Swiss-Prot record:
InterPro entries: Nucleotide-bd_a/b_plait_sf, Ribosomal_uL23-like, Ribosomal_uL23/eL15/eS24_sf, Ribosomal_uL23_CS. Gene3D superfamilies: 3.30.70.330. The gene is rplW. The keyword ATP-binding does not apply. This is Large ribosomal subunit protein uL23. Part of the 50S ribosomal subunit. Contacts protein L29 and trigger factor. Might also contact SecE and probably does contact SecG and SecY when the SecYEG translocation complex is docked with the ribosome.
Length: 100
């Protein structure tokens, strides 16, 4: 069993984009920003416990940080991890419903 403190640190924020909205409508998938060291099992457990929904599958990827300029200096944004969480049939979780 994963400790509750760890579950709270795994999920960072919902990732709101046009692609994420389409995924939610078509395949009942939510997109989340998660901790870089989070595993699929931790993400699944955190979503099920915190949002009280049934998770079917979790897919993850690491988004590489962009190179950005600030004046003459060149910097780089940090890499971050994104999780596509597919909910079971009949389950619903709406992050952007009130944003319209």
């Amino acid at each position: 069993m994963i400790r509750e403190e760890r579950l709270l640190k795994v999920l960072r924020a919902p990732h709101v984009s046009e692609k994420a909205s389409t995924a939610m409508e078509k395949s009942n998938t939510i997109v989340l920003k998660v901790a870089k060291d989070a595993t699929k099992a931790e993400i699944k457990a955190a979503v099920q416990k915190l949002f009280e929904v049934e998770v079917e599958v979790v897919n993850t990827l690491v988004v590489k940080g962009k190179v950005k300029r600030h004046g003459q200096r060149i910097g780089r944004r940090s890499d971050w991890k994104k999780a596509y969480v597919t909910l079971k049939e009949g389950q619903n979780l709406d992050f952007v419903g009130g944003a319209e």
